[in-house]
Regions:
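Structural core segment of the AMP-binding/adenylate-forming
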Residues: 1-67
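Short beta-strand->loop structural element characteristic of the AMP-binding/adenylate-forming
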Residues: 1-6, 13, 98-101, 135, ...
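Gly/Ser/Thr-rich phosphate-binding loop
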Residues: 38-42, 157, 177-185, 194-255, ...
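Conserved pre-ATP/AMP-binding loop-to-beta segment of ANL
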Residues: 53-89, 96, 121-132
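Conserved AMP-binding A3 loop
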Residues: 85-112
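Conserved AMP-binding/adenylation subdomain of ANL enzymes
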Residues: 108-132, 140-182, 196
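Conserved ATP/PPi-binding loop(s) of AMP-dependent carboxylate-activating enzymes
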Residues: 262-266, 277-302
Length: 302
């Protein structure tokens, strides 16, 4: 397990009941350089006292692990498309959080589906210019994991990681340094951004798309975003179990319509009643999804 030292005391308590054999400890200043990193770590540990005492025998510091690995030789494992890639735990909206078993082919499929879906947008980026995507979402969330991180790798793009999107002034300061092309976010972040006085300190003229997920985007927020950037928020729908994107509004849409759009390529969706039968047009029902991005099942829950 790789863990921030701020939470190591919690890990220490539960470690004996797990099968974990290796612990890598990270500190907030590890990637900030020798002097700035040391200063940040001192403040976090001693001034703000954000690191409770702990004792984990055999734990290795992050920088030490990197140093050890720099001289090692990578032995690539034999990975097949049906091998498990991620146990993506759900938000627990229906009870206890469950581990969605996502295979390598599930994630690859969803990246390719999103690439095909967004081609009309990304194709408008000037030739030779690197696609720049903002990631103001936690990477442990499937939205950020696939749509931001994996999508940027597929595109050979630049991913701007925002550590704390609640700190809008700092986020705007960072975004103002870049030519932003794609802005994925949740409604609360879109709302906070467009209503903040520093929103226009960012040059949004290079924006080709804004995508909303995680929760419904409010119409008033979408309207204000369109007025200020000239680009609509394209809302989609997905969940941990579908890697995550299952549907979306067409990439060439010119306005927000309040819907979750239509299924992605090679994806089928139905609305079913309590008996598992399709509901009539216009009636509410449970969404059933079939496609290459759908999980293999729930971990240890046959």
């Amino acid at each position: 397990i790789v863990i921030l030292e701020n939470f190591a005391s919690t890990l220490e308590k539960c470690l004996p009941a797990t099968a974990i054999r290796h612990v890598v400890l990270c500190a907030m200043g590890d990637q900030l350089g020798l002097f700035k990193g040391a200063l940040v770590n001192y403040v976090v540990r001693h001034s703000k006292k954000l690191v409770p005492s702990f004792h984990i025998p055999g734990a290795v510091r992050f920088n030490e692990a990197v140093a050890r690995g720099s001289s090692a030789t990578l032995s690539r494992p034999d990975i097949r498309s049906d091998d498990v890639a991620v146990l993506q735990y759900t938000g627990g909206t229906t009870g206890v959080s469950k581990g969605a078993v996502l295979l390598h082919r599930n994630l690859v499929a969803n990246v390719l589906q999103n690439e095909a879906w967004g081609a009309p947008l990304m194709g408008t980026i000037p030739r030779g210019e690197q696609a720049t995507i903002v990631c103001a979402l936690p990477l442990y969330h499937i939205f950020a994991f696939t749509y931001c991180m994996m999508q940027s790798m597929r595109l050979g793009g630049k991913l701007i990681l925002i550590a704390n999107p609640r700190d809008l002034p700092t986020m705007f300061q960072e975004l103002s340094k870049h030519r932003i092309h794609l802005m994925p976010a949740v409604n609360t972040l879109f709302n906070g951004m467009v209503n903040h006085p520093e929103f226009n300190t960012v040059d949004w003229s290079h924006l080709v798309g804004a995508t909303g997920g995680g929760s419904a985007v409010q119409g008033a927020v979408a309207k204000l975003w369109l007025e200020k950037t000239g680009r609509p928020i394209l809302e989609g729908y997905g969940l941990s179990e579908t890697s995550p994107v299952a549907s979306g509004n067409p990439a060439d849409a010119t306005d927000y319509n309040g819907s979750i759009g239509v299924p992605l390529p090679n994806t089928w969706m139905k609305l079913l009643d309590d008996d598992g039968k399709p509901v009539a047009q216009g009636q509410a029902g449970e969404i059933a999804i079939k496609g290459p991005q759908v999980m293999a099942g729930y971990w240890q829950r046959p």
